């Protein structure tokens, strides 16, 4: 099939009213990626060299989204909702370019995979004009049935039109199909709208092709792969299926997940062998983790790069631009954003590091803050190799701490510190003997007087 050209036509024009959302249905996300983008990825993995996405509701928002996740895809607008065949013909310009295979798919089936699509394409390569993808749901009620005879598909029958015998068929229509490019437009143009709704149904091409003496067959996908999303409950179901698959894939690739069901991956998470992930960890888009890292419980990571043998968390937050080098440590209740933590450096607890570099082997004490924002602009903090920053320090950017520099605890550092220098940035402590007792007695007396006055008012 590698020699056969292929176009995917992805139908994504529906309003999706059951989602009860201002966002077009197919832009709701699975693993941080719009549903329709998952469909495009599957089509491309199955050999589609071009993608035509048919849009309607929220067209401008859809165009912007498509540009982000698939710049090469084209969008075509279905101006009126006149049925699925009518929607496919909105992409007539693309279909007419002479592709060998046309994959017709739906933007709300995010779990479809290349294997199911390639099986349908294989049937076209073997001579079929149409290959319809079917599935076997636990309960077929409500689905159109695939009616076969002698190994050929002769009709797709909506349940309300099924005979009693046809209602017993468990093989149902998933809505997706592969159509030979040489026949596609002729078959689509032959679809009529003489039905109760006055719409043009894609399923009619099965009988039209059969009447023209063309071969029509059915292939089978799993129930999960064919799952269509119509509401938030089904969206959550699909998310669960996707996550379960990705967790299994990670574990079989050498990643240890202590409590797999509590770890959530993004569509693009990369994670190396011998990494250990503790319970309740969330990975957002753009995370790359090399082998041997340890991610402790309740960490939240997005847009971050974590090198080999790093240690993260528990309760750590790594935001976009966080770059942890080999054996770096970011501990509990720390946030790192747009910052490099170099080899062996330690940011152990209760710390914010933003727009900064922490040099190799440096140690950042508890409660340290890089003050990087003045309300208008961001500024950079550079902490040199082997530097030590004492607890509860504020580093007011732009500022640099030289190699081996030492910052005393509780300092507010507003000027750069040279290599190997010691810097204090705090008021000198003053101790007044007996003053503590005096204050305590004064405060106790004032509190008692206030309580007495309050009682008198009642």
UniProtKB/Swiss-Prot annotation:
Superkingdom: Bacteria
Pfam families xrefs: Hexapep, NTP_transf_3
GO BP annotations listed: cell morphogenesis; cell wall organization; lipid A biosynthetic process; peptidoglycan biosynthetic process; regulation of cell shape; UDP-N-acetylglucosamine biosynthetic process
Positions annotated to bind acetyl-CoA: 366, 372-373, 391, 409, 426
UniProt EC number: 2.7.7.23, 2.3.1.157
Cofactor binding note: Binds 1 Mg(2+) ion per subunit.
GO molecular function: glucosamine-1-phosphate N-acetyltransferase activity; magnesium ion binding; UDP-N-acetylglucosamine diphosphorylase activity
Binding site residues for UDP-N-acetyl-alpha-D-glucosamine: 11-14, 25, 78, 83-84, 144, 158, 173, 230, 319, 337, 352, 363
Cystine residue pairs: none
Localization, UniProt: Cytoplasm
Sequence segments annotated as region (N-acetyltransferase): 254-458
Active site residues of this protein: 349 (proton acceptor)
Annotated spans, Linker: 233-253
Subunit text: Homotrimer.
Protein name in the entry: Bifunctional protein GlmU
């Amino acid at each position: 099939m590698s020699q056969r050209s292929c176009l995917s036509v992805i139908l994504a024009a529906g309003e999706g009213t059951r989602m009860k959302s201002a966002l077009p249905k197919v832009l709701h996300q699975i693993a941080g990626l719009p549903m329709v983008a998952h469909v495009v990825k599957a089509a491309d993995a199955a050999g589609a060299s071009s993608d035509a996405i048919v849009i309607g509701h929220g067209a401008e928002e859809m165009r912007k989204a498509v540009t982000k996740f698939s710049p090469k895809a084209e969008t075509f607008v279905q101006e009126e909702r006149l049925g699925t065949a009518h929607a496919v013909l909105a992409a007539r310009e693309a279909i007419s370019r002479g592709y060998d295979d046309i994959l017709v798919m739906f933007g709300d089936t995010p779990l479809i995979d290349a294997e199911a699509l390639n099986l349908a394409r294989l049937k076209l390569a073997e001579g079929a004009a149409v290959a319809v993808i079917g599935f076997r749901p636990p309960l077929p009620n409500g689905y159109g049935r695939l009616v076969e005879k002698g190994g050929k598909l002769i009709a797709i029958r909506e349940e309300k039109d099924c005979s009693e015998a046809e209602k017993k068929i468990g093989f149902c229509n998933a809505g997706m199909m592969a159509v030979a490019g040489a026949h596609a437009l002729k078959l689509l143009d032959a679809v009529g709208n003489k039905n109760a709704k006055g719409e043009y149904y894609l399923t009619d091409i099965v009988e039209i092709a059969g009447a023209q003496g063309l071969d029509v067959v059915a292939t089978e996908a799993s129930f999960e792969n064919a799952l269509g999303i119509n509401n938030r409950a089904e969206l959550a179901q699909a998310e669960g299926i996707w996550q379960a698959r990705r967790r299994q894939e990670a574990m079989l690739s050498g990643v240890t997940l202590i409590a797999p069901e509590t770890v959530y991956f993004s569509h693009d998470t990369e994670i190396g062998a011998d990494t250990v992930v503790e319970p309740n960890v969330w990975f957002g888009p753009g995370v790359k983790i090399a082998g041997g890292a340890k991610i402790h419980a309740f960490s939240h990571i997005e847009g971050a790069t974590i090198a080999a043998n790093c240690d993260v968390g528990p309760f750590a937050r790594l935001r976009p631009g966080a770059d942890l080098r080999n054996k770096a440590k970011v501990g509990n209740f720390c946030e790192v954003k747009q910052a490099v933590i170099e080899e062996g450096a330690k940011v152990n607890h209760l710390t914010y590091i933003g727009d900064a570099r922490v040099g190799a082997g440096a140690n950042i004490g508890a409660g340290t803050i890089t003050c990087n924002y003045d309300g208008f602009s961001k500024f950079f903090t550079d902490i040199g190799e082997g530097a030590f920053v004492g607890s509860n320090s504020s580093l007011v950017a732009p500022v640099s701490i030289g190699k081996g520099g030492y910052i005393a605890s509780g300092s507010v550092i507003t000027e750069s510190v040279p290599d190997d220098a010691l810097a204090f940035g705090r008021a000198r402590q003053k101790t007044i003997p007996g003053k503590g007792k005096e204050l305590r007695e004064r405060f106790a007396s004032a509190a008692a007087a206030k309580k007495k006055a309050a009682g008198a008012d009642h």
